Amino acid sequence: MCDGSPKLDCSQLTVSPLPAKSLSASPHNPLFGFLNVYKPQGITSHDVVARLRRLTKIRQIGHTGTLDPFAEGVLPICIGKATRLIEYLNDDKEYLATVQFGAATSTYDLEGDKTFTSDIKVSKEDVIEGLKSFEGEISQLPPIYSAIKVKGKKLYEYARNNEEVEIQPRKVVIERIELKSFNKELQQAEILIKCSKGTYIRSIAHDLGENLGAGAHLIKLIRTQAGKFFIEKSVMLNDDLDVNKNLINPVEMLDIAKLEVNEEELNKIRNGQ
């Protein structure tokens, strides 16, 4: 019986991966699985979901890890009953961020109004030294233009209505942060960041500029990885995208302990024995 018996730990039970053909769509077996989509610039994460719903004629589609409209890169999509697994896709993310020094903005990115400008020129060495303060677990203040809810309202709603609201700092973990390139003339830095879920890269750009006294904001953001979803294996969102061909079995992407059983044992489990 599934009652905590030492013979079988049901809390760690998963059925072995099904063959790829089992993910094929049919009237009796609708699409089910993950899709590693490359979200382009200029559209929202929900726009990606809407396009896939039109393409597949399936309503049950969701995404994890929202990307801002100006950002691009890996956006994990859950299709069919795989949407029930969204909460398990909480792995670390990796980004390639381009930061512009010399001005801070209201949104911490290129879409906001300038709130501060400076003639201070930063050096490559300044940036490298400045990044050290973001290593490990840090306390981060989210941007006022974000979807975090405070007292039932999203922060950006307070911002748009010019209402004051107290923003609480949040603990996030920066596993890796390093300067990839620096353009002294343009005052732009390309930074690689591997971080925990919930990290705002815009805040890192803003805070870095503030710490260096020059002001800064994010002008480009590419998500290169989300857990086991890598940019190299992502698919473009085209009208001719073969969703079924590119579906990924959830078992391959989730770090859930599994127990392989034979047919006889599986039947016993199904019968509650």
Describe each region flagged by the PLM:
Residues 88-139:
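Acidic, low-complexity central loop/insert segments
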Residues 60-90, 157:
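Glycine/acidic-rich beta-strand-loop module
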Residues 2-40, 44-67, 74, 125-128, ...:
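Accessory RNA 3′-end/elbow-binding domains used by RNA modification enzymes
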Residues 146, 150-175:
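Extended alpha-helical targeting/anchoring segments
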Residues 77, 97, 152, 204, ...:
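Residue-level signal for inorganic ion chemistry
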Residues 86-101, 165-179:
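Structural signature of FAD isoalloxazine-binding scaffolds in flavoprotein oxidoreductases
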Residues 99-101, 160, 176-181, 193-197, ...:
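Short, structured patches in soluble enzyme cores that scaffold and shape functional sites
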Residues 54-58, 72, 76, 165-213:
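The conserved catalytic core of RNA pseudouridine synthases
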